[in-house]
Amino acid sequence: MDDESDDKDDTKSFLCRKSRNLSEKKRRDQFNSLVNDLSALISTSSRKMDKSTVLKSTIAFLKNHNEATDRSKVFEIQQDWKPAFLSNDEYTHLMLESLDGFMMVFSSMGSIFYASESITSQLGYLPQDLYNMTIYDLAYEMDHEALLNIFMNPTPVIEPRQTDISSSNQITFYTHLRRGGMEKVDANAYELVKFVGYFRNDTNTSTGSSSEVSNGSNGQPAVLPRIFQQNPNAEVDKKLVFVGTGRVQNPQLIREMSIIDPTSNEFTSKHSMEWKFLFLDHRAPPIIGYMPFEVLGTSGYDYYHFDDLDSIVACHEELRQTGEGKSCYYRFLTKGQQWIWLQTDYYVSYHQFNSKPDYVVCTHKVVSYAEVLKDSRKEGQKSGNSNSITNNGSSKVIASTGTSSKSASATTTLRDFELSSQNLDSTLLGNSLASLGTETAATSPAVDSSPMWSASAVQPSGSCQINPLKTSRPASSYGNISSTGISPKAKRKCYFYNNRGNDSDSTSMSTDSVTSRQSMMTHVSSQSQRQRSHHREHHRENHHNQSHHHMQQQQQHQNQQQQHQQHQQLQQQLQHTVGTPKMVPLLPIASTQIMAGNACQFPQPAYPLASPQLVAPTFLEPPQYLTAIPMQPVIAPFPVAPVLSPLPVQSQTDMLPDTVVMTPTQSQLQDQLQRKHDELQKLILQQQNELRIVSEQLLLSRYTYLQPMMSMGFAPGNMTAAAVGNLGASGQRGLNFTGSNAVQPQFNQYGFALNSEQMLNQQDQQMMMQQQQNLHTQHQHNLQQQHQSHSQLQQHTQQQHQQQQQQQQQQQQQQQQQQQQQQQQQQQQQQQQQLQLQQQNDILLREDIDDIDAFLNLSPLHSLGSQSTINPFNSSSNNNNQSYNGGSNLNNGNQNNNNRSSNPPQNNNEDSLLSCMQMATESSPSINFHMGISDDGSETQSEDNKMMHTSGSNLVQQQQQQQQQQQILQQHQQQSNSFFSSNPFLNSQNQNQNQLPNDLEILPYQMSQEQSQNLFNSPHTAPGSSQ
């Protein structure tokens, strides 16, 4: 039993282990398959990676993707007007397409750093072609200075990392940019573009040296623009970059459908052998706009551009021969009435039973206009057979021959003749068309190589084959410079070709492009019709003047030759009407009967042609000009010449046709010419009679046979009747009557009557004399004005001279003031020297007084010494000097203060006591001191000191008086009064200073009141020194 249980356990464990191994193997296989899928997505090479490397690469990729997403969110448009399901790039592309604009970034030196792809549809340039150009290369030359001024005075510049852009940083300007494209248009083809953007500092752009700029490094142009060469001093910030959008103000509707998703730019369709739609792919509606049920059963040719039909037909012929192929670039009309460029790869699918062609499978691919431009440039470089013919700068003929592997096509482009004059120059047209004939002879051997409008008689050719015509008017030729004062002429193109190639224009829209073969005529404006009518009137006037001149010359002949003259006039008239190259507007032409005969042999008129005629060429459309229909001879009621080869002049009998067939239009035209001929004949006869009368009168007046005309009076009714009668007789004569209704005769110096010519000469002489008098008076007036201006200039110079003299006087006064200041400084120095001498004397006096004070040692007055000085006379003299000047001069006041401050130091109490005693004895000898002075020597010493003191004070007073006199003299010289001389506040201050101090003690001596008052008033005249 134990063995059986062990066996059961083993089998269970085995089964569990086996199932576990299977599940692990399944998990490993699934993990390996996932790792292989990741390696196929991550790895960029065919080398096999291990599992760990695949996982590491996946983690790194996810990190980078998340970081890029976070970075893009910073610059993502967060406004509400942007749909959430559109990315930033898609929304920007759609905005540019809807605004008909493009983005451009260029530096201050003009180098273009970036241009969006939408510039190709707007101006016809590829973005990579613009990177080697500058904005000055595209801009109109007259706008270069405005562009330079914009960069020299920029608006507030945005920093490199600044994201908040306000309207204050925005700048708007207009300029004209040259158009590009497949065809080399004129140099004047410019479009007005509005730029809106801002300036930004580019940290990557360095200023660089001149050598770097010349080498084209650091984003600078290799060659400086012409505006910088003309203005070498112009300084612009080379780190400045303009970022903005440009919008063409008059869009030329150059569009191709922009496909955002690159995977949805092709679709598939099936066509029958008659090229009708049998099937349309589900990818087609987003591209062409049509649903499958809308196009099934319709022909593909209904959606192709008219200019591309010939190349498409040639490609389909090649498809029928080879069974497969690739079409050229062609335009397809979408449901939104836009033209998109397509290229198709197709092959023929055969029936499985009878092996006959069943249908054609086409794979259509949308191509951009840039690719079309590249392909056209490559073909142009390969062919190299384009030639341009220019005559006098007024007409331009472009003959180009393009060869390809699919179909050989020869295309000749004829620009309209732009004639500066109103009349058509036949020689210019003949030369241009002669060159055209030689150019097309190589590609079309069946066409006669003689010029279409040849003025020489050429032998008729055996055969004449005229190729069909095609005309188109591209939208790019609407106007070269729009919205400006420059509006060049519009161009029209006429094509001559045998097999039409891919010569379509890239600038067509459904609204202005030709969509059917019947609309082949070019547009003739009313202005051109007016020019042709003016041309006819001009020739009629010329014919009238010529006949008039001839008749004047023939009046001297005899009357016998009148019939012969009339015959000659008729011949001249016929020659003029036949030989004049006039374009006659066409009236509605009815059906005509065709004569049997050769294709290019036209019956001639019944009379010989005086000169070879010029007939409008056959490439011009029938609705515009009266011409012969190619390949179908028609008899005209007036003399014409064959279009390609006029026949030589033959006899009248040989050129008479058997039958003449005329349309109603031709018969009507013949009637008009006959009536005009009759009117001209009558007019010629009338003029002959008038000229004969005038010549007779002139002859009589020359020999004074004609008497002066008498005065005649006319009534108003008679005057009008006579005037009307004369006008009816002559048609061009006018009558002028004076106010008195009389003709006033005039006579010359010999007494002969003056005729009208002499009277006119006299009037002209009088007019000349009046003009000379007027010129003389004007000259005198000009001389007077010049004299007045000369006198005004003299007065002005005198005033300037007076001003200069006044300035010189002011300078002299300033110099005098400086000299006076120097003198005052010298006086101050002298006073300081005198004060020093006085101080030395005071020191000697003080030494003697100290001896006396030491002996006495008395101090009755304590407060009096602070206000008194040793020299009362000096103080009183200073006070008098100050009161005399009265503050008239601040410098003098300062000198007085300096004098007061330079007094000797104050004495002590003993000195003051001695001074009081001296003053008391001087004032009154009756003062009794209760002290005895026993020393006799002291009295004698005091007397000596007094004598010295009085002599020093006298010297000081004399010096002060001299100073006062000098100051008075200076005041008289300056002649100016000072405000401070009459200032009462300064005097009041001095008076306040003269008052007694309040801290004086009562003297303990016996003296009278008057003596005490004199005692205390005399030493305090100048207390300012103690303050």
From Swiss-Prot:
Residues 443-486, 1006-1027 have a biased composition (Polar residues). Residues 15-65 form the bHLH domain. One of its GO terms (biological process) is entrainment of circadian clock. The record marks 20, 24, 28 as: Interaction with E-box DNA. Widely expressed. Found in head, body, and appendage fractions. Residues 780-1027 are annotated as: Implicated in the circadian rhythmicity. It holds the Pfam family PAS_11. GO terms for molecular function: chromatin binding; DNA binding; DNA-binding transcription factor activity, RNA polymerase II-specific; protein heterodimerization activity; RNA polymerase II cis-regulatory region sequence-specific DNA binding. It is found in: Nucleus. SMART domains: HLH (SM00353), PAC (SM00086), PAS (SM00091). Residues 383-402, 504-516, 552-575, 871-909, 951-995 have a biased composition (Low complexity). Gene3D superfamilies: Helix-loop-helix DNA-binding domain, PAS domain. Residues 88-160, 255-321 form the PAS domain. GO terms for cellular component: CLOCK-BMAL transcription complex; cytoplasm; nucleoplasm; nucleus. SUPFAM superfamilies: HLH, helix-loop-helix DNA-binding domain (SSF47459), PYP-like sensor domain (PAS domain) (SSF55785). Keywords: Biological rhythms, DNA-binding, Nucleus, Repeat, Transcription, Transcription regulation. Contains three polyglutamine repeats which could correspond to the transactivation domain. The length of the repeats is polymorphic. In the arrhythmic mutant JRK, deletion of this region leads to the loss of circadian rhythmicity and altered light response. Circadian regulator that acts as a transcription factor and generates a rhythmic output with a period of about 24 hours. Oscillates in antiphase to the cycling observed for period (PER) and timeless (TIM). According to PubMed:9742131, reaches peak abundance within several hours of the dark-light transition at ZT0 (zeitgeber 0), whereas PubMed:9616122 describes bimodal oscillating expression with maximum at ZT5 and ZT23. Clock-cycle heterodimers activate cycling transcription of PER and TIM by binding to the E-box (5'-CACGTG-3') present in their promoters. Efficient DNA binding requires dimerization with another bHLH protein. Forms a heterodimer with Cycle. This is Circadian locomoter output cycles protein kaput. It comes from Drosophila melanogaster (Fruit fly).
